């Protein structure tokens, strides 16, 4: 991970998220509902639900909305049943893309995803065409200036798998997916507050894009993220947009 301007990418990512905040609640409600349906309504015994509730809290989702989503998932309230789908494909410069969806209409979703790829210079691929390049892991990013040795000691004590210092001075803590929320809570209790973090599918081999290619790739990612059925978009692309 070292060598990339992680800090600049975080600021760009946050600006895009703020612009799309209106869709965040809808996606969180879907995720909470599905997580509760698959693993039950107790976040202590359901890591996927616990992660979804962490995100809901970070985005100030009203507790009533959260509880209704859980109740729909556990069957206490009637609701739409969503299925999870994953699509794989290629973007600008052959950069890999994985698109996770929750939908009640598979035919609509695949048509929308294919259209977004085709219209924006990408290609929808076959199952498994890029998945081999991604690893499922959690990460937490801390701003430059944090004491690396002290953070590393606290992170490893909390159950993190690795700690990486990027060239721009930011520090990244890597966790197993199911350990992410626990490590985050433990570090916050120790006085370390992350500026970014999530459980994600991270590319092991990245594709750096700059200039027009980076702009085109961002447009493709935005088109996919704007689809109602899309929950997450993962890519091997590292965009140099400055």
Curated annotation (Swiss-Prot):
Keyword Cytoplasm set for record: yes
One GO CC term on file: cytosol
Entry annotated with the keyword Transcription: yes
Localization (cell): Cytoplasm
InterPro entries tied to this protein: Integrase-like_N, TACO1_YebC-like_2nd/3rd_dom, TACO1_YebC_N, Transcrip_reg_TACO1-like, Transcrip_reg_TACO1-like_dom3, YebC-like
Keyword annotations from UniProtKB, A to Z: Cytoplasm, DNA-binding, Transcription, Transcription regulation
GO molecular function, one term: DNA binding
GO biological process, one term: regulation of DNA-templated transcription
Main location: cytoplasm
Similarity annotation: Belongs to the TACO1 family.
Protein name: Probable transcriptional regulatory protein NGK_1508
Source species of the chain: Neisseria gonorrhoeae (strain NCCP11945)
